[in-house]
């Protein structure tokens, strides 16, 4: 990824750093429009997810998370920008004439070949079941339910590690630090998701954030008491509480928000680290 640094000619471009290499030219048969209504609002128009709204119109790219074209070699033709995720995507031309998008593996270049199946080589971009992978393999786009497609480790730079196999289950260490069990028959893609330097980018101004559909974030301490528990006071006043709270009065730091009776509770060996 090539990071382009702006010259400090105006305040809006000062400290700006964007990716200037990957462009977007999607295929018409692999995109479709989405109807986004509300953008953070519920059916009554009330805000349920803050800091969302506006943004440029998007076309959704059909991504092949299942990788079910077994034993058919494909060639990477393009590496494109996807407005719906922070990872890049690759256009694959398969030997049977089919064309699909997949997540861009780190280090993959135009012209590389990939394949998915049960007895394929352990090579970056290839997809195969966990039972056929050696221990210590770096993987991404991991299935939770067999045949449903990859659901874990899909963000830019995400990578998980296969650390054990016992019985019908495989033990994975996820990017969050969580260690959990998954069926050995589930598939995953070898390697790490590309665009590792996504955190190095700096948009430089609030208007660029608005193009992405992200509205400004206002601190509660500068609000009025009617708007936030931290609000009010004369001048720069403290929050007036022992610990910070959310706009609805719940503890903001340290409180666990995961439901206790989830089906996957028995599959998690170690909860994610902070």
Curated annotation (Swiss-Prot):
GO terms for molecular function: rRNA binding; structural constituent of ribosome; transferase activity. The gene is rpl2-A. One of its GO terms (cellular component) is mitochondrial large ribosomal subunit. This is Large ribosomal subunit protein uL2cz/uL2cy. Gene3D superfamilies: 2.30.30.30, Nucleic acid-binding proteins, Ribosomal protein L2, domain 3. The lineage of its organism: Eukaryota, Viridiplantae, Streptophyta, Embryophyta, Tracheophyta. Belongs to the universal ribosomal protein uL2 family. NCBIfam families: rplB_bact. Keywords: Chloroplast, Plastid, Ribonucleoprotein, Ribosomal protein. Residues 1-22, 225-274 are annotated as: Disordered. Transmembrane segments: none annotated. It comes from the Eukaryota.
């Amino acid at each position: 990824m090539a990071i382009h640094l702006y010259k400090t000619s105006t305040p809006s471009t000062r400290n700006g750093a964007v990716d200037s290499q990957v462009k977007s030219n999607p295929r018409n048969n692999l995109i479709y429009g989405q109807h986004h209504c509300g953008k953070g609002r519920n059916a009554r128009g009330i805000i349920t997810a803050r800091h969302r709204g506006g943004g440029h119109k998007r076309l959704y790219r059909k991504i092949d998370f299942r990788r079910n074209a077994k034993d058919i070699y494909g060639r990477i033709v393009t590496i494109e920008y996807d407005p719906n995720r922070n990872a890049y995507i690759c256009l694959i031309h398969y030997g049977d004439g089919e064309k699909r998008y997949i997540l861009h593996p780190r280090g993959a270049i135009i012209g590389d070949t990939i394949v998915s199946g049960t007895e394929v080589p352990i090579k970056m971009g290839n997809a195969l079941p966990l039972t056929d992978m050696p221990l210590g393999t770096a993987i991404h786009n991991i299935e939770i339910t067999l045949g449903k497609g990859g659901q874990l480790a899909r963000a830019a730079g995400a990578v998980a590690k296969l650390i054990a196999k016992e019985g019908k289950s495989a033990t994975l260490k996820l990017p969050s630090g969580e260690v959990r069990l998954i069926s050995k028959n589930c598939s995953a893609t070898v390697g790490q998701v590309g665009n590792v330097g996504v955190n190095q980018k700096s948009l430089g101004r609030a208007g660029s954030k608005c193009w992405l559909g992200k509205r400004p974030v206002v601190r509660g301490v500068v609000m009025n008491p009617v708007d936030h528990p931290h609000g009010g006071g004369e001048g720069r006043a403290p929050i007036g509480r022992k610990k910070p709270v959310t706009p609805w009065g719940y503890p903001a730091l340290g409180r666990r928000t995961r439901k206790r009776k989830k089906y996957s509770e028995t599959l998690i060996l170690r909860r994610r680290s902070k």
